[in-house]
From Swiss-Prot:
Gene giving rise to this polypeptide: RPL26L1
Cystine pairings recorded for this chain: none
A single cellular component GO annotation: cytosolic large ribosomal subunit
Listed name of the protein: Ribosomal protein uL24-like
UniProt-listed CDD domains: KOW_RPL26
Crosslink position(s): Glycyl lysine isopeptide (Lys-Gly) (interchain with G-Cter in SUMO2): 136, 142
Entries under Gene3D superfamilies matching the protein: 2.30.30.30
Region of interest (Disordered), residue spans: 1-21, 122-145
Family of the protein in this entry: Belongs to the universal ribosomal protein uL24 family.
Protein's GO biological process: cytoplasmic translation; ribosomal large subunit biogenesis
Gene Ontology MF term list: RNA binding; structural constituent of ribosome
NCBIfam families: rplX_A_E (TIGR01080)
Amino acid sequence: MKFNPFVTSDRSKNRKRHFNAPSHVRRKIMSSPLSKELRQKYNVRSMPIRKDDEVQVVRGHYKGQQIGKVVQVYRKKYVIYIERVQREKANGTTVHVGIHPSKVVITRLKLDKDRKKILERKAKSRQVGKEKGKYKEELIEKMQE
């Protein structure tokens, strides 16, 4: 059910917006979930992927246990290139295989001050969401009296 009249649910319009999206919007679209350990640590579910993050492929032909570093984030093609995810071309040269960020899990973040700020902001908003709509014990006790 559609609630907002200003947001379209037309498939062709959504595809058009996806494939014609500017770079700053593509950054948000190219987000990856965090591993269970990082999710526990930072209380954040996903982050936009960036070069030098360590990731593990969890879907597709290249899924497996090896963890590789992100070599390049190619926003134009909506793919990332990972250290050990390569294939051999017919002429013998090896090339990186593009993988969509939603098909990987971030196992180690490359942190700088801006990224730390983003993590803090996301964790704070999640904390507010958990508290929302819950009665405090003092209020319940007062109501029962």
